[in-house]
């Protein structure tokens, strides 16, 4: 797939981050594991795509595995490669749920308040270190789904 030469205004490009064994049709399916469908990719490193490449980015139960020290840089990169008017859909286990605590590879807990930092470009002080989001997503909708284990989010880029 060629991601450099395309008309940003016409062509839809979709990215599935952390596809695992569940690639999505019509998406570029990437994963850090050997199961990667289309491309091996470590999202904690700079992403190999030009600015505003994708109209839609999807990540299902991936972002809770991002190390804390990489959290803001990963979202900064997602924001960078998402086109204006594009959407980011993701779901993560709710902090404190059994789903969060039963997997020892979960490193980043999420709550509704976590999204404030992504949506409003806020800063977070933790253990004397200030982490900041120098970008802001637009909150499109946070569906009210009666699932006490998982949080679902849709963010946009204006």
Predicted ranges, named:
Residues 72-84:
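A short glycine-rich, Lys/Arg-flanked "PGG" loop and its adjoining helix->strand segment in the class I
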Residues 85-93:
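Conserved beta-strand signature within the Rossmann-like core of class I S-adenosyl-L-methionine
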